[in-house]
Amino acid sequence: MSGPKLDRTPSIRDRVEDTLHAHRNELVALLSKYVSQGKGILQPHHILDALDEVQSSGGRALVEGPFLDVLRSAQEAIVLPPFVAIAVRPRPGVWEYVRVNVHELSVEQLTVSEYLRFKEELVDGQYNDPYILELDFEPFNASVPRPNRSSSIGNGVQFLNRHLSSIMFRNKDCLEPLLDFLRGHRHKGHVMMLNDRIQSLGRLQSVLTKAEEHLSKLPADTPYSQFAYKFQEWGLEKGWGDTAGYVLEMIHLLLDVLQAPDPSTLETFLGRIPMIFNVVVVSPHGYFGQANVLGLPDTGGQIVYILDQVRALENEMVLRLKKQGLDFTPKILIVTRLIPEAKGTSCNQRLERISGTQHTYILRVPFRNENGILRKWISRFDVWPYLEKFAEDAAGEIAAELQGTPDFIIGNYSDGNLVASLLSYKMGITQCNIAHALEKTKYPDSDIYWTKYDEKYHFSCQFTADIIAMNNADFIITSTYQEIAGSKNTVGQYESHTAFTLPGLYRIVHGIDVFDPKFNIVSPGADMSIYFPYTEKAKRLTSLHGSLENLISDPEQNDEHIGHLDDRSKPILFSMARLDRVKNITGLVEAYAKNARLRELVNLVVVAGYNDVKKSKDREEIAEIEKMHELIKTYNLFGQFRWISAQTNRARNGELYRYIADTHGAFVQPAFYEAFGLTVVEAMTCGLPTFATVHGGPAEIIEHGISGFHIDPYHPDQAANLIADFFEQCKQDPNHWVEVSNRGLQRIYEKYTWKIYSERLMTLAGVYGFWKYVSKLERRETRRYLEMFYILKFRELAKTVPLAVDEAH
């Protein structure tokens, strides 16, 4: 259940009552269908299927009435005969709840708490204690400004800047904290920005005007050292810039902020203040290393993301410090778990420098219990009893490595976000969360039926940790809007944490608000040293072309590749993904197989999973392998189709995209749902025209018909025809392929690069650091509430997770 922000208007109830008066028989027939299914939860498609049945038997008026809007926006219905309660979501982030008594035909509006209490009765009525712990974070956020339009969700920093600049514009006294903020800047004992010669805003403005006049007479490239002494006498310290030109820009920005603040100027100025010198990135679970780890348990995309992230972040920090005229060396630490039984990886080394960086290291800290260090790997679902001690130990190790405290901490996934919360609370630093995936949304009804899952997954711990970390974070970044607030018809991952219940444990009536300005969309890119356009001939890895040709054309049928391509002059339609039901590779193969026009125009090559069922231990993958073999036989795909087993060499995969581009082919991402779509970004970065699912992140990455194409995997025939149309057009006009390829690249360069990501992240860290300071947003009340919840609930739940036992040596 995902239920959230309650819009307390009676409109939904009114619509139900109006329909009851106007179409009593049809509505009773519909509600009776729901009730006849017995106690349970109805999903949106169940709700609408029953409506279709009523419509086909004469309930036309019901379909045309106002009640249709209610049912179309219903996210679930709870059936407890004779009652049906419906959670209605008119738009992202806004919820209402109604309950209908089918026998009495009465309608009532429910509060979040009432709805959740009713839902709990599904669990055999065993949790009927009237005194259940309810968590409500809304009162703590009453003073925090927030937008109310769904389109504003995920643009938190823009909203915050508008709010801050308007306060400063209306009330000049609100500029005082900015003065204090600039005067309080120090790093390793060095004063930056302003010294104590400047005690008032008036003095600051006159000094800035004097500095502006002085700098305007100097060449723009004059080094700071040539006027540093004069500036210091006036009260200005290092940190304004490395040259007269850059310092003058900064002074103009601050003068504008002091005279007539606007959101853009404020953000630019705050983003340029030297605030971030040392960063900690927390990612405890899995085998975190740089080599021989991908494919090990709990070890995949998150590690690739973080390694690309920190390389870009270090480059940005070095560049900013140079521009700020500071000679400090930045440092980034990735704090993860040290695993003595490292399975041939480097995960048993305490410190490891990240390749391609100068100042970024993996710092590994072991999990400990009363028996000492835990030696073996444990699942991400079993880490909860170790995290508190891990955070304490990590704090000491971080202090030793940095010779002080970090300025900024980034948590990753549920465990990393909880540890980041503990560390940021202890150190008083700005915290950013990245979820990567929120497990609650992956397992339907894992909240209401949590006891079913708890022995294996310990979701009671994980959901509790998620709520604590979300509310403790200063800001949260996501890759897409849908991750926060879903779409018109689907609930966002964060949105599903706004209201839910774990019967017998606690009830969340207001957990997180998707309208909170802490949410920001900052999309990652692809590593441009690996993924770059096919046209950049000098950088191409031509030495790999022989092995790639074998991969695609070698006639031998083995466990690395099966199938063959008779006509190599045809373009290649390409896809690469895990072989599971959601990624829908077999769906793509079937759509291709059934479309004679597409088969005539292109060959199909897919990289996915194993082609031998004996090699897989995953039931879902085995089913997909069997389905793929069946499709090859049924549709006689030999000669037009090649199936290559999963490839983990990223450098070779990058060249494979470009190799496909050389054939004037295209990339397809056919998933039923894709949270972000990194392969879409990789393919577009290599210059491949891309067709990708409309369900999830790719719908935001691609502008349909401009930088690529959206396809709906639930309508495979339409998708296949769209792809065939593209290749027919390319056949008639080869320049069409080049145009789509170039527009795809343009889209990437505008929005989806690690450089854009790191610039944005550093700016956010500056703005939220300032916001925390000027509004005194230490959130003391919230933090006390969270502390109580952590100690009284999370710690007790963590004790229920069995401790791992190392095998005797």
Curated annotation (Swiss-Prot):
Tissue specificity of this protein: Predominantly expressed in the leaf tissues and in caryopses.
Protein name (database record): Sucrose synthase 4
Chain residue ranges for the region called GT-B glycosyltransferase: 275-753
SUPFAM superfamilies for this protein: UDP-Glycosyltransferase/glycogen phosphorylase (SSF53756)
Pfam families: Glycos_transf_1, GT-B_Sucrose_synth, SUS_EPBD, SUS_N
Enzymatic class: transferase
Cited PANTHER family: PTHR45839, SUCROSE SYNTHASE 3
Protein family membership: Belongs to the glycosyltransferase 1 family. Plant sucrose synthase subfamily.
Keyword Transferase: yes
Keywords per UniProt: Glycosyltransferase, Transferase
Gene Ontology MF terms: sucrose synthase activity
Domain of life: Eukaryota
Gene, per the UniProt record: SUS4
Keyword Transferase belongs to the record: yes
Signal peptide: none
GO biological process: sucrose metabolic process
Catalytic activity: an NDP-alpha-D-glucose + D-fructose = a ribonucleoside 5'-diphosphate + sucrose + H(+)
InterPro entries membership: Glyco_trans_1, Sucrose_synth_GT-B1, Sucrose_synthase_pln/cyn, SUS_EPBD, SUS_N
Lineage: Eukaryota, Viridiplantae, Streptophyta, Embryophyta, Tracheophyta
